[in-house]
Amino acid sequence: LASIARGLLTPAKAQPAPFDRSIVRQMAREAASKPFKAPDNKLPDNLKDLDYDHYRAIRFSPDRALWHGEKLPFEVQFFHRGFFYANRVDIYEVANGQATKIAYQPEYFSFGDNAPPKAGVDLGFAGFRLHTPINRPDYHDEICVFLGASYFRAVAKGELYGLSARGLSINTGQAKGEEFPFFKTFWIEKPGANATSIVVHALLDSESAAAAYRFTIRPGDTTVLDVEMAVYPRVELDHVGLAPMTSMFFFGPNDRNDVDDFRPSVHDSDGLAIFNGRGEELWRPLHNPKDLQISTFSDLNPHGFGLMQRQKNFFAYQDLESGFERRPSLWAEPIGDWGDGSVQLIEIPTKEEVHDNIAVFWKPKTALQAKGEHTYTYRLHWGPDAPKPSALARFSRTGVGAKGEDSKIFVLDLVGEKLKSIDPKSVRGVVSAEKAKVQNIVSQPNPATGGWRLSFELSVKEKVPVELRASLVQGADAISEVWVYRWTP
């Protein structure tokens, strides 16, 4: 009787079919050889026009989770379609080399004030989330979610959701308009009883390309996603983004943007970090511009890049509900040579914190040719910092303020073990600017942080953007990463 009851509580399944990773690539290859077919987004009348609050009222029942009660390290819960998430997503369980489709049942969900769909209607799902005991051994925490277009996000131990990653970006920041690829099918491999990772396969489609993915997800103090992807363009892709990520920067000490708010900062990420192929480490603080801005960091075979949340102190935010200090950083580590290209940073004006206004991705220099196969492998690290903390001092805070007419003062704080024992007399700040005058450069220990403070004044006569670079050096040797910034009048 117990086994029968458990069967009634777990998701219904269809007939199995053989599966291996090559099948997803073959499906993507075949899809790209045919005209694009728009996704199924048809919903019953009572679901297609849901607002945010009514959609939130539809909740998955945890006791219906895939593998619930089987004493496995992972469980899967599903999202209902509706609101922004109208597209149908099909999800399969893979076990013993067989893929079995998870059939939609309205009984998996509670609908609040919403009328449930009619029985027997197969709506599919909008997406899913993975649960595992990451914070304590007796509770399956949510650690990763795939929901909406090709968006996904994850958290490490003790963290809250923040920025998102995407499977692929196309024409982001281009005048002709962005194209949003979407995951249409997932295959989730059933883990063993002692598994520390879980594997998810995905099929992506879009007007311009199809793609196949294999994600290996390893939760922990840093949650790591190994991503293997193969892209099959229908047309030449000259503005494609690899390892794309999306975040929010509303305001901070470098850019309050005329916001009247009791909080000192509001952001999911405060800067872009790059470890380029030349071995140079860059830090670019984010800002909320008045107009769309695109920054290009040309490179050859980058070691990594990511959107960081370096401010981990509650007092930097003063927000009891949002917990910005617990939002993760996201670092993308290419595996193998990615060749010529650039890290692209796109900053979009926003007047509200609810909008993601920051995009970062790797743009290959050479367009991806139609009818070909283009493969990439990379590793995404979700956690408190980049996976391999640098020996160089790093910039932890950027403050900007007025300093008389046509002048600004920049105050940059740095932290790092090396700074605690260095001879202050041997350290100097190096600052350069295009189309502006830099003066009063001061570098000194910061006893409040145990680090260092570099400050300077910038005089600007022309109302044009100014590109800035700053670092700390000891003799001819760099002892900090390089701070780069675009100041816009």
Cite the ranges covered by each PLM segment:
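Short, hydrophobic/aromatic beta-strand segments
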Residues: I102-A103, A211, L237-P244, Q318, ...
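Solvent-exposed N-terminal domain segments of exported/luminal and surface proteins
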Residues: R29, S33-K176
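A contiguous, surface-exposed recognition patch within enzymatic or periplasmic domains that forms
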Residues: D51-D53, V145-L147, D238, L242-E373, ...
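Acidic, contiguous internal or C-terminal segments within carbohydrate-active enzymes
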Residues: A202-F251
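Extended, loop-rich substrate-binding clefts of extracytoplasmic carbohydrate-active enzymes
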Residues: K157, G162-G220, G339-E347, K351, ...
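A mature extracytoplasmic/lumenal domain signature
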Residues: A95, P106, A202-L204, P219, ...
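Terminal accessory/anchoring regions of large secretory-pathway or extracellular enzymes
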Residues: Q15-Y52, I58-S61, F79, A316-Y317, ...
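N-terminal export signals
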Residues: L1-A14
